[in-house]
Amino acid sequence: MAPVWPAARGRTGGLGTRGRVSPVEFRNKNVKRKTWRPNHLQAFAGSVREGQGFAFRRKLKIQQTYKKLLRREKKSQTPSESPFTDWYPDHLKHLYLAEEERLKKQLRKADQPLSEEQVDQPLPEDQGSSDQALSEERCSIEQPQPAEPCSIRINSINIPKKNKKKTSNQKAQEEYEQIQAKRAAKKQEFERRKQEREEAQRLYKKKKMEVFKILSKKTKKGQPNLNLQMEYLLKKIQENN
């Protein structure tokens, strides 16, 4: 009777695991394995305990924007009064304020056309007396002057002239016109020089062609005409002398 061989027990996994190769068998032993290091380079500065990473920077940004909004609200809540009224001296503040009101009224009257009846009417006594008092106190404070020029100043209504300043559009228009004028002058100068250069080149070529015709003439035998060449040279020497 033939001997029966037992089934191979050491085969890799039977039918289900046929063809699989474990990675341990074919691992290269010469290559060094990378060890895990806990202190690797971080993607941001600081740590969670220190609190100086991206979260801390985001917190600072939010605080800055909040403070900026508070400053804007304070600026918008401030009353829009004239900043110069607080700087007046205390003993002359009422005079400056009265003068401001008087100038405002004069400007309003100057803007509106007056009728004939309003022109003929004299100034009221209260206004004239207040104007006199203001002008007299000004004269006494600023410089001790006689009473006559002060009275003359009272009668004449001094309306400040409006400074006619040029707008940015007008300034830009003037600058553009100046630049255009400069460009036109440069273009004319360039055209003039170009014409002069072309004229000089034309005369030079004409003269060279005449000389070439004289020197290129030949005799009946086809030889260069030396007599004409000598005459040309003598003529040139005489012109130089």
UniProtKB/Swiss-Prot annotation:
InterPro entries: Fyv7/TAP26. It is found in: Nucleus. Residues 186-201 have a biased composition (Basic and acidic residues). It comes from the Eukaryota. Residues 1-21, 107-201 are annotated as: Disordered. GO terms for cellular component: nucleus. Signal peptide: none annotated. Residues 151-160 have a biased composition (Low complexity). Interacts with NKX2-1. This is Thyroid transcription factor 1-associated protein 26. It comes from Bos taurus (Bovine).
